[in-house]
Amino acid sequence: MFDQTTNTEVHQLTVGKIETANGTIKPQLLRDAVKRAVTNFFSQLDGQEASEVYEMVLSEVEAPLLDIIMQHTRGNQTRAANMLGINRGTLRKKLKKYGMN
């Protein structure tokens, strides 16, 4: 499972605010998209039990997030870590987890 840092990051991203140079953005659209995707996932289970849904959702959000941020920063891990609000070591660990190193 993910550590507490990841839980905090996802919580801030989905229910908090994102600080930018031009102000604060509330990511309601992201929250709504995740809610629709999870609802769709459960509707397709056809009565089967799901397991490890938390891990699945986090990895499905985290992997593309890391990919896009690394593209945005042109591979600059220090900038990417700062944008994510995590330290560079944590970023490197996450990139390795998803084979993005």
Swiss-Prot record:
SUPFAM superfamilies given in the database record: Homeodomain-like
GO MF terms held by the record: DNA-binding transcription factor activity; sequence-specific DNA binding
InterPro entries: Fis_DNA-bd, Homeodomain-like_sf, HTH_Fis, Trans_regulatory_Fis
Pfam families: HTH_8
Gene3D superfamilies named among the record's database cross-references: Homeodomain-like
Cysteine pairings via disulfide bonds: none
DNA-binding segment(s): 77-96
Similarity field: Belongs to the transcriptional regulatory Fis family.
HAMAP family the UniProt entry points to: DNA_binding_Fis (MF_00166)
Subunit structure comment from the entry: Homodimer.
Protein known as: DNA-binding protein Fis
Provenance organism: Shewanella denitrificans (strain OS217 / ATCC BAA-1090 / DSM 15013)
